[in-house]
């Protein structure tokens, strides 16, 4: 329950930033709107200090701070709904065919395609044990704006697993070696990142519409009493 609550709070934060509703958003000297956010939920101790969703729990930061998005996400009733995907069809008990949106680009400028999703998920299961154990992938094939995933076992919960923050789709052509260069499909781009601070700038080409908050500064606060 706590995990689902954290996911909900992360999506709420992104929604506030998209709509320019952050409680501490204010213009800086350059006239940009800046949202400064202190949190106890980011840092080395949380295993989420970074933006590589294929490592530990960093996917929570990728999603929460608007850098990446998943193929599906949970609604308020905890039912998976399409996000970067438009729908899915189970071909059999082991296999699901997912159709992708055709109007999405990564912040790198590369287009979101079935091949891009395939490359991302293949890297995910190579490097992320929990994802590999959840998804139990036997194969992934891509064709245009579709990707077909076959599991080694019956996979009734496969779509639910793809809602997990580790499932943020990133541009593997940009790689994952440098957190600042990680390219997702979200409304924000990493400008700088340390274990205690993230500086994000808005993605001017975000597929979901105009991003109203120009810059976000996230600072880790080790003592909750100082919030």
Model-derived segments and their meaning:
Residues 31, 43-54, 79-81, 157-160, ...:
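Short, solvent-exposed loop/turn elements at domain surfaces
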Residues 161-211, 215, 225:
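Gly/Pro-rich hinge or "lid" segments in bacterial periplasmic/extracellular proteins
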Residues 1-35, 79, 123:
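Short, low-complexity disordered leader/linker segments with a strong preference
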Residues 120, 226-227:
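Short, hydrophobic alpha-helical packing/hinge segments within bilobed ligand-binding/sensory domains
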Residues 31-44, 95-99, 120, 147-149, ...:
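Short, well-ordered beta-strand elements
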Residues 38-91, 183-184:
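N-terminal lobe/hinge region of extracytoplasmic solute-binding protein
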Residues 89-93, 97, 132-173, 187, ...:
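Surface-exposed binding/hinge segments that line
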């Amino acid at each position: 329950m706590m995990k689902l609550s954290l996911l909900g709070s992360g999506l709420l934060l992104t929604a506030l930033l998209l709509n320019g509703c952050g409680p501490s958003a204010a213009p800086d000297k350059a006239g940009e709107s800046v949202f400064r956010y202190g949190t106890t939920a980011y840092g080395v101790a949380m295993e989420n200090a970074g933006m590589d969703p294929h490592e530990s729990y960093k996917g929570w930061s990728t999603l929460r701070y608007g850098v990446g998005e998943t193929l599906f996400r949970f609604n308020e009733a905890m039912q998976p709904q399409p996000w970067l995907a438009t729908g899915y069809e189970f071909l059999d008990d082991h296999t699901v065919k997912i159709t992708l949106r055709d109007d999405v680009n990564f912040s790198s400028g590369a287009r979101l395609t079935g091949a891009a999703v395939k490359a991302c998920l293949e890297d995910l299961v190579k490097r992320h044990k929990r994802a590999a154990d959840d998804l139990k992938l036997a194969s992934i094939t891509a064709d245009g704006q579709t990707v077909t995933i076959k599991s080694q076992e019956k996979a009734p919960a496969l779509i639910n697993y793809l809602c997990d923050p580790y499932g943020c789709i990133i541009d593997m052509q940009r790689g994952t070696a440098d957190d600042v260069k990680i390219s997702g499909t979200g409304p924000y781009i990493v400008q700088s990142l340390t274990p205690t601070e993230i500086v994000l700038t808005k993605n001017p080409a975000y597929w979901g519409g105009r991003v109203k908050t120009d810059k976000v500064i996230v600072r880790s606060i080790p003592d909750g009493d100082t919030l």
